[in-house]
Design a protein with these regions (language model features):
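Conserved dinucleotide-binding and phosphotransfer motif residues
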Residues: 32-33, 40
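Glycine-rich His-Gly loop
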Residues: 7-8, 141
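Short amphipathic alpha-helix
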Residues: 18-30
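A short, glycine/small-residue-rich beta-strand->loop->alpha-helix junction that serves as a flexible
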Residues: 8-21, 54-57
Length: 158
């Protein structure tokens, strides 16, 4: 069971090469799982922020669950939606730090940090909320670094 977490995934959101990888790598591994053999047991899933620019696209989504993310001030709700991207189950993480940002990346580093810390922490809690065990957490670039750092605090680490 592999969970990819990424700030971009083409065709939903692509600013640069990270969007290419976020869209193509999970899809390529998913297609291997459909071929059978040694890869047939792969369960590939992807999580990306549910940016406002994705919300205005006409893609089918369904609400899955809410997760409370602890912050220094008070818990913030992360709402998790599901869609499919090239056959890959894709989770869209929504919540105040992500919702208030019109752009994927802004010039305000504090706002970007809050957005991606929130996203990373939500992704760590996502498998538990889904009753799904993750064997490998594939974190892409600095936007998901907090998730890797916080793995040490999880009782059942991927």
């Amino acid at each position: 069971n592999i969970l990819f977490i990424c700030s971009e995934a083409d065709p939903l959101v692509k600013i640069g090469g990270l969007g290419d990888v976020g869209g193509a790598l999970p899809a390529a591994l998913h297609s291997l799982s459909k071929e059978g053999g040694n890869y047939s047991s792969l369960d590939i899933r992807l999580a990306i922020p549910y940016y406002p620019k994705i919300k205005i696209q006409d893609i089918p989504t369904r609400f899955i669950t809410s997760i409370k993310i602890k912050t220094a001030e008070s818990p913030v709700e992360a709402r998790i939606f599901e869609t499919s991207l090239s056959g890959v189950t894709t989770y869209l993480v929504s919540g105040e730090p992500i919702d208030r940002s019109e752009m994927v990346y802004g010039l305000d580093f504090k706002t970007d940090a809050e957005k991606f810390i929130f996203f990373s922490l939500a992704c760590l809690q996502l498998p538990h909320a889904l009753h799904w065990t993750v064997d490998i957490l594939h974190a892409n670039d600095w936007h998901t670094a907090v998730a890797v750092h916080q793995l040490k605090d999880l009782p059942n680490k991927p």
